[in-house]
């Protein structure tokens, strides 16, 4: 019996981008919605056929963009700017949780979620209709 050696190759590759190489769409998004929070690190993350950009901003904000350079995840240590939250989700949160604020927003294949600073995660469909509290 002959054993054939094989090589395990990782499909995941992270590359730190020089700030000058951050795609224009991403730089524009950050300067529009986070004018006081410049980019301090940008990582281009390739995992198989999936490509994302993981952006860290000054002030404790983290944004993930997909291969089309569309936002799919935003997290903050403090309140996110209202301009980054879809209007229906923002309206729902401010109406039903007036004493709280949003520190996270995420988009997946079927739904979107917001996270409040009190730890609650609220799930919505793609039209912005409330579905449930996600524990």
In which residue ranges do the predicted regions lie?
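C-terminal motif of bacterial Sec signal peptides marking the signal peptidase cleavage site
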Residues: 7-10
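First exposed extracellular module after export/assembly in secreted or surface-exposed proteins
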Residues: 18-135
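Short, conserved catalytic or interaction motifs in soluble domains
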Residues: 13
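Sec-dependent signal peptide recognition
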Residues: 1-4
């Amino acid at each position: 019996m002959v054993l054939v050696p094989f090589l395990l190759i990782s499909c995941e590759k992270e590359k730190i981008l020089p700030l000058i190489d951050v795609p224009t769409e991403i730089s524009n998004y950050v300067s529009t919605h986070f004018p006081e929070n410049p980019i301090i690190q940008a990582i281009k993350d390739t995992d198989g056929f999936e490509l994302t950009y993981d952006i860290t901003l000054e002030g404790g904000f983290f944004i993930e963009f997909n291969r089309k350079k569309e936002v799919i995840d935003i997290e903050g240590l403090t309140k996110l700017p209202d301009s980054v939250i879809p209007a229906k989700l923002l309206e729902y949160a401010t109406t039903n949780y007036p004493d709280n604020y949003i520190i996270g927003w995420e988009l997946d294949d079927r739904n979107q979620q917001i996270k409040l600073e009190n730890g609650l995660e609220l799930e919505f469909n793609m039209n912005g209709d409330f579905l449930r509290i996600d524990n």
